[in-house]
């Protein structure tokens, strides 16, 4: 089976998950044919990832949340203004994602919490499964409760998370705690 990874590259967790999954897929005889990484203008894809992924990487601009002055939470107004100015760049990114999915011959799309991948898959319906992976999909689980002092409003997190998985065939919610799968919501807890 041929696989394309689309990864939200702002943190290091999704990149590390992609490295681990790639090794598992290779062990089972599958091939990761392309890796797309979304990032903001200020981020650099870490060298450890570039050295270890062993598959062609293409980087694209992707929305992100800007921190507050004290760097303890994100600044909603600043983030909205900043990302609104970059909409033309994000439209180019959607085109890049679409083109790569269409041309790489993948049998499946693995989306590591990349919002523009969710939008692209919802708009264009490629006829192949999109599987979304990340601990954030646990936010959509009816039994999950947000910690008391979380820096981002729960409704905003859930809204953003839903956009990342629009058009998804499955959502794999990574968790260290036991939760039942939620077939109604398409969530499998792993």
Model segments located where?
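Active-site-proximal region of nucleotide-activated glycan assembly enzymes
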Residues: 124, 128-189
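Conserved nucleotide-sugar donor-binding subdomain of glycosyltransferases
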Residues: 73-108, 115-116
């Amino acid at each position: 089976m041929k696989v394309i990874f689309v990864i939200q590259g702002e943190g290091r967790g999704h990149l590390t998950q992609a490295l681990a999954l790639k090794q598992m897929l290779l062990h089972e005889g599958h091939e990761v044919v392309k890796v797309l990484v979304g990032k903001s203008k200020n981020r650099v894809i870490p060298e450890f990832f570039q050295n270890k992924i062993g598959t062609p990487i293409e980087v694209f601009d992707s929305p992100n949340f800007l921190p507050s002055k004290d760097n303890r939470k994100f600044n909603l107004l600043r983030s909205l203004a900043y990302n609104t100015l970059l909409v033309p760049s994000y439209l180019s990114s959607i085109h890049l994602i679409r083109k790569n999915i269409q041309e790489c011959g993948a049998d499946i799309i693995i989306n590591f919490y990349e919002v523009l991948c969710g939008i692209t898959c919802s708009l264009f319906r490629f006829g192949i499964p999109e599987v979304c992976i990340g601990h954030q999909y646990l936010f959509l689980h009816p039994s999950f409760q947000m910690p008391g002092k979380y820096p981002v409003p729960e409704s905003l997190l859930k809204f953003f998370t839903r956009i990342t998985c629009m058009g998804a065939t499955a959502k794999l919610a990574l968790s260290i705690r036991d939760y039942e799968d939620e077939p109604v919501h398409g969530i499998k807890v792993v």
